[in-house]
């Protein structure tokens, strides 16, 4: 594994089944939520199909004790820097997963990680 893919990359990819890298279980949670809250039936069908491809392609990295510890460290850093970590809970779980795995986080949303950009290795796709 060379990188962890953020949810934004999974959503933005034309063919998510061709992406290379790993994903966090937190990304699957975000994708499942996205399927369940959309009201338009056509969009729900598109999201469900994309989620199926992603689940068939990737074996997500878990949020285990090591990731929980790293999440705490990153959340504390955000709080110390004047941010609100609870608003970014899923992003922090994904960043913590990347840090524990020792790989960069590939994201379209670098601004989401601005307060901890010195603590997480970020890349754009």
Regions found by a protein language model. Give the residues of each.
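C-terminal structural segments of small proteins and small subunits
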Residues: 100-112
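PIN-domain endoribonuclease scaffold, especially VapC-family toxins
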Residues: 2-3, 13-100, 114-124
């Amino acid at each position: 594994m060379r990188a962890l893919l953020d949810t934004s990359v999974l959503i933005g990819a034309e063919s998510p089944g061709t992406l290379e890298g790993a994903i966090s279980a937190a990304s699957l949670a975000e994708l499942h939520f996205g399927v369940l809250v959309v009201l338009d039936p056509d969009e729900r069908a598109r999201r469900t199909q994309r989620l199926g491809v992603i689940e068939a392609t990737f074996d997500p990295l878990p949020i285990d004790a090591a990731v929980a510890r790293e999440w705490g460290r990153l959340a504390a850093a955000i709080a110390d820097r004047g941010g609100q970590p609870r608003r970014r809970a899923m992003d922090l779980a994904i960043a913590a997963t990347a840090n524990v795995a020792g790989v960069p986080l590939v994201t379209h949303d670098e601004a989401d990680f601005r307060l901890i950009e010195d603590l997480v290795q970020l890349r754009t796709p």
